């Protein structure tokens, strides 16, 4: 409910049903990106390559989306503000896990189509975060990481959050 008030978007309460994916907020011209990182137990067609690498976030669209899909074009053209909400697992035992607000993303580049692999810069990436859930998301390392895409990110001068945590 709080999110619907912040974005002046009452349909979030009705329209969002604990699923991953894109949710467009017309009133605020904001796209909310909901991502569950751990894909274990999903069919191979749904094992998208989603993870942080330093202050960059790698995201794969759903397989049905192509580079020319309207929502993907809005992301690439920077038409809407993009806010990432992520969680490691959808459920823990019988409880649905909440999404964590990871902040604003900015499109950087993309590769391939169906699914489209998009690289975002995380505008609100916090090297000094004390939020354990957010740190876990930053450090999440899928076993298939980078298998489907190349990782050509300039990391000069960056301090990895993993370098500060023992």
Task: Place the predicted regions along the sequence by residue.
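Compact mixed alphabeta submodule
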Residues: 91-147
């Amino acid at each position: 409910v709080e999110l619907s008030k912040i974005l002046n978007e009452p349909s979030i309460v009705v329209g969002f049903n604990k699923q991953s994916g894109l949710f467009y907020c017309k009133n605020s011209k904001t796209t909310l990106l909901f991502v569950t990182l751990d894909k274990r137990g999903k069919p191979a067609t749904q094992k998208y390559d989603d993870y942080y690498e330093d202050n960059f976030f790698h995201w794969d669209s759903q397989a049905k989306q192509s580079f020319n899909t309207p929502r993907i074009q809005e992301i690439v053209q920077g038409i809407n503000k993009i806010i990432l909400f992520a969680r490691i697992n959808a459920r823990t035992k019988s409880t649905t896990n909440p999404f964590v607000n990871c902040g604003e993303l900015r499109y950087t580049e993309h590769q391939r189509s169906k699914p489209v692999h998009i690289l975002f810069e995380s505008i609100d990436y916090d090297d000094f975060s004390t939020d354990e859930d957010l740190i876990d998301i930053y450090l999440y390392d899928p076993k298939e990481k980078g298998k489907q895409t190349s990782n050509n990110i300039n990391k000069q001068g960056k301090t990895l959050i993993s370098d500060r945590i023992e």
